[in-house]
Amino acid sequence: MNKFSKLALVGIVAAGSLAIYASPSFAAEVGSTTSKADITFKNDDGTTPTNPVDPTNPGDNVTPTDPDAPTPTTGKLRLDYVSNIHFGEQTISGSDTTYKAKYDEVLQSDGVTKKYVPTFAQVTDNRGTNAGWKLQVSNDQFKAGTEELTGAVLTLKDATLNSANVSKPTNASTVILNGNSLTQDVVNAPENSGMGVWTNAFGKTIGADETSENASVTLRVPGETKKAADEKYVTTLTWTLTDTPD
């Protein structure tokens, strides 16, 4: 008797459970309507340069401290910034010698804290056409007055592209400038790449300070080249941005 009652009770509970799950509820629709969202775009007027960003952390704006920083270009496709390159004072040597550049000093977004970043160039493409672009560079020979630093070779290597965007262009890992004014490719952004803000930096910056030297930006001077003491030798690098990628 007890066994039968127990089984009957279990059967009743199970049946009750099935009854509960077999009773779905339906929401009664009483009406619907539609709404819209819209946006209208206007052209970037191209008159306001984009702030330079940290080439090692492109989400942060920086302010270069070099008083002779190059003038940015204007337009919807523009060259925002290029580092000057400083090798400082060096002792004359009669042997072939390679000199390393200083890092580029910038102020972080607080306007106070200094940071030392690799030599870099920054391009902004706000055209909205996704047509691509190309950055090239050339230079003349280092000179002090009319005296050339014959045979001097400027090398920019270990290039790294950086951006908050993902449509990555391609870059030359090494750029060699012989002072012959021949144009060298730096960055090529084919169609559907290179939109927004992009930096191309030469070298790394971990732990750099005002005394650090960047082994990725070098000047090689032959030992047999004449060198005048207390004279500053200067080369002009011409950076050219075009809207005709490869």
Residue ranges and their predicted role:
Residues G11-A19:
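Bacterial N-terminal signal peptides
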Residues F4-A8, I20, P24-D246:
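Signature of Gram-negative chaperone-usher
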